[in-house]
Amino acid sequence: KSRQGLLLQRCDWLPIARKLDLIEPAARHFLRGVIERVREKHVNGEDLRLYLPVAASSLFDPAFAPWLAAEFGAHAVPSHVVALEFDAAEARAELPRLRGALEPVQRVGVRLALNVGAADAADLGKLLAIDAFGVVKFARAGDADAKPETAWEPWSKAIAEARSLGKIVVASGVAGMADIGVLLRFGVHYAQGDALSGWLAEWDFDFAEAEL
């Protein structure tokens, strides 16, 4: 009821929403706010493209895709400027019924991205084989002090596989320009990270993209 707001990152609001059994309402409220943000930027002539973290369980709500399409239409925001980002571990847990659930959301026109963390290195093949995931984000392994080779070498085979399947490959959490040489060698398409640009870093979306 106040005009003051507290920005909750995905790691904060998802556990709260699960505990309250409010995953779908929380995700929708979150998405609506960001779509409005995109509209504001487009009105001002700025080109803002976003990755939006979404719980995989949202896909199994039959009303989710129609609602998403209606939100884009209501705010006059083209759906292709948004990529819905799914955590690889969550997606793997829902793998048996995931493929069919992705189709209605695909028809809305949004890109679908897979966010792969350090704990998701095993058994990525089945997820990468899903055509709907056109974008794959690989997070830097280790902390910012880890050497570039140490931080990115664990992803070398997975990046090569994703590229062979025609995916757009994104490296997230880039710690500095020293990482870029390794990423170029691996054939990564885009790099993201606060080290490249601090713009809106507090949103934890890595808005800044530097094409390699």
Question: What are the functions of these language-model segments?
Answer:
Residues 1-15:
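A short, well-structured catalytic beta-strand-centered motif of the EAL phosphodiesterase domain
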Residues 2-5, 55-60, 83-94, 110-212:
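EAL-family c-di-GMP phosphodiesterase catalytic domain
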Residues 15-22:
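Short histidine-centered catalytic/ligand-binding loop motif
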Residues 17, 30-38, 64, 68, ...:
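Structural preference for long, well-ordered alpha-helical segments in enzyme cores
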Residues 22-97, 173:
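Catalytic core of bacterial c-di-GMP phosphodiesterases, primarily the EAL and HD-GYP domains
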Residues 44, 76-79, 107, 129-130, ...:
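Alpha-helix termination/capping residues and helix-transition junctions
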